[in-house]
C-alpha cells in the first residue's frame, strides 16, 4: 500500500479543481495507493511519464487533456508526494 502526501500548496489547487477533474484525481489516488506508479503505467489514459528540466526527478500523470498531477516518489518507500495539480502550467512558483 502506497501513502500519498499532498503538499500544502497542492491542496489549495485541488480544492479549486472542476468537479470532473476532482473525480479523476480521486481515481488517480485510488490507483496509486493500491498499486503505486506501476498501476498508472498499465492505464494508458493517465500517460504517466518522467519529467525533465527543472522538474527532473518528478513524474506527471494526465487527468485529462489539460490537467496534470505532478508528483515525486520518495526513496522507493511507498510514499508519493503530490507537488502540483495544474492546468498544464509547468512553471515552478
Regions found by a protein language model. Name each.
Residues 34-62:
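A short, surface-exposed loop/turn module that caps and links secondary-structure elements
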Residues 1, 11-16, 20-22, 61-93:
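Enriched for short, Lys/Arg-rich terminal
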Amino acid at each position: 500500500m502506497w501513502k500519498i502526501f499532498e503538499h500544502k500548496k497542492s491542496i489549495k489547487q485541488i480544492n479549486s479543481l472542476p468537479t470532473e477533474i476532482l473525480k479523476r484525481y480521486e481515481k488517480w489516488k485510488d490507483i496509486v495507493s493500491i498499486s503505486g506508479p506501476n498501476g498508472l503505467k498499465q492505464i494508458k489514459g493517465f500517460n504517466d511519464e518522467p519529467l525533465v528540466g527543472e522538474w527532473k526527478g518528478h513524474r506527471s500523470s494526465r487527468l485529462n487533456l489539460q490537467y496534470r498531477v505532478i508528483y515525486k516518489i520518495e526513496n522507493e518507500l511507498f510514499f508519493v508526494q503530490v507537488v502540483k495539480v495544474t492546468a498544464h502550467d509547468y512553471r515552478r512558483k
